[in-house]
Amino acid sequence: MTNLRKSHPLIKIINHSFIDLPAPSNISAWWNFGSLLGVCLMLQIITGLFLAMHYTADTTTAFSSVTHICRDVNYGWLIRYLHANGASMFFIFLYLHIGRGIYYGSFTFMETWNIGVLLLFAVMATAFMGYVLPWGQMSFWGATVITNLLSAIPYIGPTLVEWIWGGFSVDKATLTRFFAFHFILPFIITAMVMIHLLFLHETGSNNPSGLNSDSDKIPFHPYYTIKDILGLLFMILTLMTLVLFSPDLLGDPDNYTPANPLNTPPHIKPEWYFLFAYAILRSIPNKLGGVLALVFSILILMLFPALHLSKQRSMTFRPLSQCLLWILVANLIILTWIGGQPVEYPFITIGQLASVIYFSIILIFMPATSLMENKLLKW
């Protein structure tokens, strides 16, 4: 009799995805982030569901309901901080996952990569709307500033902004719809993740060498399931340390002040994981130009397959390209720092320089270096 996991129509799919899946024998810890992102998504959906049971999406009671969750609900503080810091973990893993994809040339799986970029946009949208829900000062002003960017779109801009707001300013209608979208989007993200995996399993995983690994495959279970569990333990350790010792480390103190449309905070800034894009937005004096730079700073990921001019897939044996990639990482850290600083000298200049370097490395230096490496290797 055939094993049930191989014959049952539903269990068979799970078997081919997580148990009998042939995986390259040499994939490193950099391949752990996919499963960690899946765990993060599940954690966010579960904690979010419990928060939604006690939260009220109304301007008069939203802030109080979050306070009530933290003070009166059994382990409400834990659920709330797991959800808030879980988002930070989510983005750390996302950026590491994308960085891995760039380093090892995983973007040559076009469908998987493009769905991944769309997933990034969806997660960013979800996180932004979630940040608005506690209805603190930074929630309100963050929502006002970011939604206002759409007014830079020629002709339809101002109408579009009022349509999104549901009125003439960020108010009750905005909060209600943001809650609705924040609730539904993670389920859409889950569906997209399944498509992401479907496309990945069409080609099989990439590996650190960037070479074809069909001749040397091992079953996913038990080798990589145990490896993923180790990664999961590290994640739980980090997340719980953050939640139990310094839950507000990554938050903004301004968000402990209830939203007040008559009082603007001195420095409006998003959560840390958006600061690099926010710095790029601010470094361009023109409103529309800034918005385009902001969108393109993420959308540029779509161009990686086209900009890949090297004869080798991975950067493993390309020291010059490696050097450029690490300069890009350092540059992104500088942009993140600048995004959290006030708009004054010397931060403006540093931000503009870092923005130019960011686009130059990706669009000019990396492809040029690839060609030079081909030449040096006489390919």
Swiss-Prot record:
Its cofactor is heme b. It is found in: Mitochondrion inner membrane. The chain crosses the membrane at residues 33-53, 77-98, 113-133, 178-198, 226-246, 288-308, 320-340, 347-367. One of its GO terms (cellular component) is respiratory chain complex III. The keyword Electron transport applies. A ubiquinone binds at H201. Heme b b566 binds at H97, H196. The keyword Endoplasmic reticulum does not apply. GO terms for biological process: mitochondrial electron transport, ubiquinol to cytochrome c. Heme b b562 binds at H83, H182. It comes from the Eukaryota. Its main location: mitochondrion. One of its GO terms (molecular function) is metal ion binding. Pfam families: Cytochrom_B_C, Cytochrome_B. It is a multi-pass membrane protein. Binds 2 heme b groups non-covalently. PANTHER family: CYTOCHROME B. The cytochrome bc1 complex contains 11 subunits: 3 respiratory subunits (MT-CYB, CYC1 and UQCRFS1), 2 core proteins (UQCRC1 and UQCRC2) and 6 low-molecular weight proteins (UQCRH/QCR6, UQCRB/QCR7, UQCRQ/QCR8, UQCR10/QCR9, UQCR11/QCR10 and a cleavage product of UQCRFS1). This cytochrome bc1 complex then forms a dimer. Heme 1 (or BL or b562) is low-potential and absorbs at about 562 nm, and heme 2 (or BH or b566) is high-potential and absorbs at about 566 nm. Belongs to the cytochrome b family. This is Cytochrome b. The gene is MT-CYB.
